[in-house]
A protein has these predicted regions:
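Conserved donor nucleotide-binding strand/loop of the catalytic core
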Residues: 5-8, 19-52
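Residues at the starts of beta-strands that form the adenosine-phosphate
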Residues: 6-7, 56, 170
Length: 183
């Protein structure tokens, strides 16, 4: 990797053996006793990063479709261009993502166009779980992130809606590869 950084995994009560794999990998991890939702896991990571004075957080959905080797592609705009928020997109370089299920090929661009229109911003893949942002963005936010109703899937739309609404936040999309299992 081009940059020095720490990798922390959030184990939210997984039962698929991944927690044992992480424990034996030598990587840092935060183990939650039970799964309280994806939002809770992200909030836990953000709070941990702020408490430990990290500057950037990069999240990758734990669905095994994104390549961690692309972390530099997602983080580079923050470090080199002073961007605040970077969103991965499987549609910027679609040729490398040609195995994306047809339903997603049709529905995600439609949803992304609606979001782009509503928030007067350009985004091509609002559902991609590969993102990075400056923690300063969270620290200076005019919205609360530690609310119980955000512990499930509500956190990501809530957080990103606030990011998209803030015209002072410098945003950028970068291409990422998504790998779906072949049927």
């Amino acid at each position: 990797s081009e940059y020095k950084g720490d990798f922390y995994f959030i184990d939210s009560g997984s039962t698929d053996g991944s927690s044992e794999f992480i424990k034996n990998s030598g990587h840092h991890y935060i183990s939650l006793e039970k799964n309280l939702g994806v939002g809770y896991s992200i909030i836990t990571a953000i709070k941990f990063a702020i408490e430990n004075e990290y500057e950037i957080i990069c999240g990758i959905s734990g669905n095994n479709k994104m390549d961690p080797n692309e972390i530099n592609n997602v983080v580079n705009p923050i470090i080199k261009e002073d961007i605040d928020f970077v969103q991965g997109s499987r549609f910027i370089n679609y040729e490398s993502n040609s195995n994306t299920p047809k339903f997603r090929v049709v529905s995600i661009p439609i949803l992304s166009k609606i979001i782009s229109f509503l928030f007067k911003t350009k985004v091509t893949d609002v559902t991609c779980g590969f993102r990075a942002y400056k923690l300063e963005l969270v620290k200076r936010a005019k919205f609360e992130i530690d609310k119980k109703w955000l512990y499930g899937y509500s956190f990501e739309p809530y957080f990103y809606t606030n990011v998209f609404l803030d015209q002072h936040v410098l945003k950028k999309e970068v291409p990422v590869k998504m790998s779906y299992p072949s049927d």
